[in-house]
Design a protein with these regions (language model features):
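Bacterial N-terminal signal peptides
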Residues: 16-27
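Cleft-lining beta-strand/loop regions that shape enzyme active-site pockets
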Residues: 2, 28-40, 44-61, 84, ...
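Structural motif
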Residues: 132-134
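Polar, glycine-rich mid-to-C-terminal structural blocks
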Residues: 300, 312, 319, 323-390
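Bacterial N-terminal signal peptides that target proteins for export
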Residues: 2-17
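Conserved functional hotspot residues or short segments at active or partner-binding sites
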Residues: 353-354, 358-543
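Extended, small/polar residue-biased N-terminal targeting/export presequences
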Residues: 55-116, 162-194, 517-528, 536-543
């Protein structure tokens, strides 16, 4: 039955608490709103009341409001977002630099929680839990079987600092289970994955995100590398999706002399704000720098690479970055949820806007990688063309380009082996993981006796033909077979190196992984060669 509006129950026109809250959120100062804005807010409130009181079935008003907010933000730009109360802490965690829990890195192996490594100095490490231990009970309840997944494990092992969780561990060589009562604590979440000497005099730092702890980690990395004789630095920001603006400014400051513009932000409701370098940089007076970027380097990564490029401070090597130059400001909502709303755009010192266009909609925006690949941009610099209006000049007279993202000074085509169907299936079906876990389950102790340090492992360990044959058998069991006519061929030698690198990560840490696998990294080797050829480096800098 359809009721004429005039005959709807009076309760439909009573302002519910939910609508009142929503209206207040959208218009904290209603007098400052235009008539059009006030009418839009009232329209939404009325629509929600009608749905709430007249819809054929019961409705969940908070869910409806959340859905409406999500759609509104989606219509604005690709990066404004709604975050539920339950997800706020999880989303912020990587940038906070820590979380609270027991302090273990784990993987699921044969429906069992396998400790890959305890966090050094963390609560599990202090109690004596070691790599290779299998957690079979949590708080007296079996933690083995098909019900076990990553979410299940994290829900039970993470928790507030000071709370206790009991685990029972099966250890190789021990008949009985070992019980541990672990008092949860703050666990550091590092943003630097690797720090080592890539070549004599050349340091390498891989930064994965711009978090609250990144600068402390960076200073420690620089100190370590200088002790090992570092003069020049390769800063790896590939696939670094960004983080805090202040951290990006502070990192840029490390390389620039005082009073240089690093970045500025500006929006309709936000006046231009300039961010300048200070005189406190640890790398501002000496030492050359190369920044590695790729199509997944975004936001804060683009601020750093853009500032270094615009001031002719170093070289940028790789492929055009993602092109995320929108500033999101968090707004807390009364129920604990959050809006991350775009309030401004980033601009590099020369005035380039980092943000790529998004007028064609969110779906097309996130197809950018596919479009770049199809247009040839990822494999050939000749396929990239910029109109004169997007050209900018640096102080040294070099031409740099706007239009979205940072175009590198030295272009390196994407490694086509990453598109190998065989390699993709090996990863997707978990063949690498299964092989590494089963191999270490049998051989961990023997390897560590023979190679007590990573340096010894790197120099002496070889993935022999028996190991590789076992790996291929594991692949065949998962129905992963290399096609005879494979378009993109992933060499056997590279697969063996990947196995060695993954073993290193499980036996030591992420840094060990990168130090092994980077032996076949074309972008890194190009950066090393440029730093070793001072004449070529200076020429590319315009000096």
């Amino acid at each position: 039955m359809i009721h004429p509006i005039g005959h709807l129950p009076k309760r439909i026109f009573r302002l519910t608490a939910l609508v009142a809250i929503f209206a207040l959120l959208l218009a904290p100062n209603l007098q400052a709103q235009s008539d059009e804005q006030r009418e839009a807010i009232q329209k939404f409130g009325t629509a929600l009341q009608i749905i709430n009181f007249a819809y054929v079935d019961s409705v969940n008003s908070p869910d409806l409001v959340a859905s409406a907010i999500k759609q509104m933000l989606k219509d604005l730009d690709p990066h404004s977002a709604y975050i539920s109360k339950e997800d706020v802490e999880r989303v912020n965690e990587p940038l906070e630099g820590s979380f609270e829990g027991v302090g273990v890195t784990f993987q699921l192996f044969n429906d069992t929680i396998l400790v890959v490594s305890p966090v050094p100095g963390g609560p599990s490490d202090k109690l004596g839990i070691i790599a290779g231990d299998k957690i079979v009970k949590i708080d007296g309840v079996s933690a083995v079987g098909e019900k076990i997944n990553n979410e299940y494990v994290m829900e039970r092992l993470r928790g507030k600092k000071g709370t206790t969780v009991s685990v029972a561990v099966k250890r190789n060589g021990k008949k009985d289970l070992i019980d541990f009562d672990i008092v949860r604590d703050k666990i550091p979440l590092n943003s630097i994955d690797a720090t080592y000497m890539a070549a004599p005099g050349i340091g390498y730092i891989k930064l994965t995100r711009f978090s609250k702890t990144s600068m402390d980690e960076f200073h420690e990395s620089v100190r370590e590398l200088r002790q090992e004789g570092m003069q020049d630095l390769i800063l790896d920001l590939r696939s670094n999706s960004g983080g805090y603006l202040n951290t990006a400014v502070e990192l840029s400051d490390e390389f620039l002399p005082a009073d240089k513009l690093i970045v500025y932000t500006e929006g309709l409701h936000q006046a231009r704000e300039n961010f300048y370098s200070t005189s406190t940089g640890s790398f501002d007076k000496e030492g050359r720098v190369i920044v590695l970027i790729n199509e997944a380097s975004a936001s804060a990564s683009e601020i750093v690479s853009g500032a270094i490029q615009d001031w002719d401070r170093g070289l940028v090597v790789g492929r055009r970055s993602f092109g995320k130059g929108l500033v999101q400001r968090p707004f807390r909502l009364p129920d604990g949820s959050m809006i991350r709303l775009t309030t401004a755009r980033y601009h590099t010192p020369t005035g380039r806007c980092i943000q790529k266009p998004y007028a064609e909609g969110v779906e097309e925006y996130f197809k950018d990688f596919k479009n770049r690949l199809e247009h040839g941009e990822l494999v050939s610099a000749d396929s990239i063309h910029f109109p004169d209006s997007l050209q900018y000049l640096t102080p040294a007279g070099r031409t740099v380009y706007g239009g979205g993202g940072i175009m590198p000074d030295v272009f390196i085509p994407i490694d086509s082996t990453r598109f190998s169907d065989y390699y993709t299936d090996l990863v997707r079906k978990g063949v690498f993981n299964d092989y590494i876990m089963s191999y270490l389950d049998k051989n961990r102790a023997e390897i560590l006796v023979k190679y007590p340090t990573f340096a010894a492992f790197k120099a002496g360990f070889v993935v022999d033909e028996q190991m590789y044959s076992d790996f291929k058998a594991k692949a065949a069991d998962a129905k992963v077979v290399r096609a005879a006519d494979e378009k993109y061929y992933y060499p056997d030698s590279d697969l063996k190196l990947q196995i060695k690198a993954l073993l290193a990560r499980n036996l030591w840490d992420a840094e060990a992984y990168f130090e092994v696998i980077n032996a076949i990294d074309t972008e890194l080797s190009t950066a090393v060669e440029l730093l070793q050829n001072k004449k070529q480096f200076s020429k590319l800098q315009g000096k």
